[in-house]
UniProtKB/Swiss-Prot annotation:
CDD domains: RRF. It comes from Roseobacter denitrificans (strain ATCC 33942 / OCh 114). This is Ribosome-recycling factor. Its main location: cytoplasm. Transmembrane segments: none annotated. The lineage of its organism: Bacteria, Pseudomonadati, Pseudomonadota, Alphaproteobacteria, Rhodobacterales.
Amino acid sequence: MSEDFMLDTDDIERRMDGAISSLKTEFASLRTGRASASMLEPVMVDAYGQRTPINQVGTVNVPEPRMVTINVWDKGLVGKVEKAIRESGLGINPQLNGTIIMLPIPELNEERRRELSKVAGQYAEHARVSIRNIRRDGMDQIKKAKADGLSEDDQKLWEGEVQEITDRYIKGIDDQLATKQAEIMQV
């Protein structure tokens, strides 16, 4: 029976990829003082009787490093899009020009940069915890197989493989965090 044990490392990696994907989404929502279309992804507009993402009511562009524009398709929604942005907590003051909403991105002060850097660190720690939980699930499968007759050598081999995958993903999180924090702190 122990010869038949195969740990599904593809499943472990797929689940860890999900944690990394969530981290990237959280990082994208952090405003770094540089314009990006992704910073508006969490903003929802009350349009046509339902909450709708901004990119479904207009075209989002980044014409300059510190400017985002939204070309709203339905003139009747311009006010609702403006209101959604003001209430989003992004700290951006929309300026109207017909059906185009311009969003000048203000510089971040030093205190706000430090705050955002800490938030990025918290997001990274949540991702690390997710990775470690997935690692623990893999290790539990190996321990169960050991109880069912898996040899100690095979157990060590599988545990080493799970640890190597975990280390690789944790390093990826640390690298992404360092990049994001450098981006946030850049003036």
